[in-house]
Amino acid sequence: MKHEKGRSFYIHTFGCQMNQADSAIITAILMDGGFRVAGSQEDADIVILNTCAVRENAVERITHQLQFLRGAKRRKKSLLVGVAGCVPQHLKREMLEMFPVIDFLAGPDTYRNLPALIGDAEEGKRPAALEFRIEETYAGIDPLREVGVGAFVPVTRGCNNMCAFCVVPFTRGRERSQPFSAVMDEVRRVVEKGYGEITLLGQNVNSYADPEEGRDFASLLRAVSREAPGCRIRFTTSHPKDISPDLVDAIADSPNICNHVHLPVQSGSSRMLHRMNRGHGIDEYLETVALLRRRIPGVSLTTDLIAGFCGEEDEDHEATLALLREVRYDNAFMFYYSPRFGTAAWKTLADTVPLAVKKQRLQEIIDLQLSISAECLQEAVGSVVDVLAESESRRSTEQLMGRTGTNRAVVFDRGGARPGDRVSVLISKASSATLTGVNQGVLPAFYS
């Protein structure tokens, strides 16, 4: 379908890092199709909301944005509004009935269709491309990323784990991996463009399985580390059951792989983990934590936690608090449970915990974790850390902000450093969420 060449588009990205990576893919596809990037949402001929369906409040945010765009459309009759990503994949064509402002829908596997969808929308057809395509990994597309220090490189898409609370398998489809050769080609392009950090992405990144040669994630991680010796390497998100000793060795043995592992646990109760269909109990989880700490001294661990899942009792909640005290995570993403349509929990488990109890338990988790996080930061005072400078500090142009390999935010005096530099910083102060330090000098670009 033909469309008007040169129309401008703006992508409003919600949710996870994978969505940010997908927005870069969408940008490349549309630019290749003759569209151009608008400087702002107000200036755009086409606005695309790239959406997240993981939590109920994410859907509410999209609803508010669509209400705003309804007013924008009254002022600019030619404006097209598209919704991409997980929400349309979850709600299907019902979204078109719910929100008349929407002109087209695209699921996570159909972004190559966007130029044609826009062409149909210009003719008033309100098209939707929402099928799953198990072969689609967007290999061969060179994402058009925003300017910055770090680059996201997706290596898996979808998820096969079927955790009871999680909508991802129903919005992202079955798990599939990028070919090893495609990942390495993308890593080379990222290095050539001068990025200082590469984050390998997947809904369950450490289940990576190369479809061509069968390489696992540990093998891929080592190869990326060797190919990009001047880049810091991160990965997310991990599933605890797929953290292998070989993967831990790869992190421990490679100087440019960050000593930070995001290890979602969701609950400290084995009974709740079983109800959540997580595939492991708390003892196995703690064995993985012990392995990481034994092989990688100073490793930073972060996690995800859900308060008030179906059937959670006081003793289950207390087990979660006990886990926080034992593991002492650097940080955590913490939420109370909200049922998601179509999931196993929504279909088979009663949402028995009252909302007030969920909120109270969540607050107790937050309060405890914030105190632990503050203590962890305070322990860093007096140490010298390797920081990748990301940007100017919001407080002063004379300061830079960056992150350590353990993913701690650090603000320090600029000196002669610039965003993208590795900087040695002496930590002098810790607040509740940020470290402050003194610039000790720019470090060599290559890790050793």
UniProtKB/Swiss-Prot annotation:
The gene is miaB. Belongs to the methylthiotransferase family. MiaB subfamily. Catalyzes the methylthiolation of N6-(dimethylallyl)adenosine (i(6)A), leading to the formation of 2-methylthio-N6-(dimethylallyl)adenosine (ms(2)i(6)A) at position 37 in tRNAs that read codons beginning with uridine. Gene3D superfamilies: Methylthiotransferase, N-terminal domain, tm_1862 like domain. Residues 7-123 form the MTTase N-terminal domain. Keywords: 4Fe-4S, Cytoplasm, Iron, Iron-sulfur, Metal-binding, S-adenosyl-L-methionine, Transferase, tRNA processing. InterPro entries: Elp3/MiaA/NifB-like_rSAM (IPR006638), Methylthiotransferase (IPR005839), Methylthiotransferase_CS (IPR020612), Methylthiotransferase_N (IPR013848), Methylthiotransferase_N_sf (IPR038135), MiaB_methiolase (IPR006463), rSAM (IPR007197), rSAM_horseshoe (IPR023404). Residues 378-441 form the TRAM domain. It holds the Pfam family TRAM. GO terms for molecular function: 4 iron, 4 sulfur cluster binding; metal ion binding; N6-isopentenyladenosine methylthiotransferase activity. Monomer. This is tRNA-2-methylthio-N(6)-dimethylallyladenosine synthase. Its cofactor is [4Fe-4S] cluster. Its EC number is 2.8.4.3. GO terms for cellular component: cytosol. It catalyses: N(6)-dimethylallyladenosine(37) in tRNA + (sulfur carrier)-SH + AH2 + 2 S-adenosyl-L-methionine = 2-methylsulfanyl-N(6)-dimethylallyladenosine(37) in tRNA + (sulfur carrier)-H + 5'-deoxyadenosine + L-methionine + A + S-adenosyl-L-homocysteine + 2 H(+). [4Fe-4S] cluster 1 binds at residues 16, 52, 86. It comes from Chlorobium phaeovibrioides (strain DSM 265 / 1930). It is found in: Cytoplasm. The keyword 4Fe-4S applies. Its main location: cytoplasm. Residues 145-375 form the Radical SAM core domain. CDD domains: Radical_SAM. Binds 2 [4Fe-4S] clusters. One cluster is coordinated with 3 cysteines and an exchangeable S-adenosyl-L-methionine. [4Fe-4S] cluster 2 binds at residues 159, 163, 166.
